[in-house]
Amino acid sequence: MAETSSLISGVAQRYAGSLFELALDAKSVAAVEKDLDRFEALLSGSEDLKRLISSPVFSSEDQLHAIGALADKAGIKGLVGNFLRVVARNRRLFALPGIIAAFRKIAAEHRGEVSADVISAHELSAAQQNELKATLKGVAGKDVTINVTVDPSILGGLIVKMGSRQIDTSLRTKLSSLKLALKEVG
């Protein structure tokens, strides 16, 4: 499992780096980010699309035609539209979520921002996200972009990963620590 994750991460980094260089040359990093956001919204809203990009059952041609038609219908043209077609042709659609995340991190670093991955037990409101960004900015000394993921299994609290640092205030971790402490006592 770790090897598969590492493979996807490596593929995602290479493709994201290439896309970023092309976007930088074309002076269209912001436009590319918007198109990737639009595609990610389509992806998160469609189980069929998730199946298309992750299943090896579909042929390269089927994936290419489906992604091309979807990109055209969603108005994703130019650099991102062509990029999605190349990724489909090369049978790397499975790495798209990682590519999008890696592109965001590269773009944020280029703008002088720090990226933080936040795992929450429930959806964070805009006010909570803004407060978290301000707090993390005080720690990092730079603007912080947050990528929020909802994971109900942490029960409560947050897990924040920023660079090489991780802050885990989840209720699950606190309960695990308490359980260990009680085992040592008893």
UniProtKB/Swiss-Prot annotation:
Record flagged with keyword Ion transport: yes
Entry keywords, A to Z: ATP synthesis, Cell inner membrane, Cell membrane, CF(1), Hydrogen ion transport, Ion transport, Membrane, Transport
Ion transport found in the keyword field: yes
Domain of life the protein comes from: Bacteria
Assembly: F-type ATPases have 2 components, F(1) - the catalytic core - and F(0) - the membrane proton channel. F(1) has five subunits: alpha(3), beta(3), gamma(1), delta(1), epsilon(1). F(0) has three main subunits: a(1), b(2) and c(10-14). The alpha and beta chains form an alternating ring which encloses part of the gamma chain. F(1) is attached to F(0) by a central stalk formed by the gamma and epsilon chains, while a peripheral stalk is formed by the delta and b chains.
Family: Belongs to the ATPase delta chain family.
Name this polypeptide is given: ATP synthase subunit delta
Biological source species: Brucella anthropi (strain ATCC 49188 / DSM 6882 / CCUG 24695 / JCM 21032 / LMG 3331 / NBRC 15819 / NCTC 12168 / Alc 37)
Source taxonomy: Bacteria, Pseudomonadati, Pseudomonadota, Alphaproteobacteria, Hyphomicrobiales
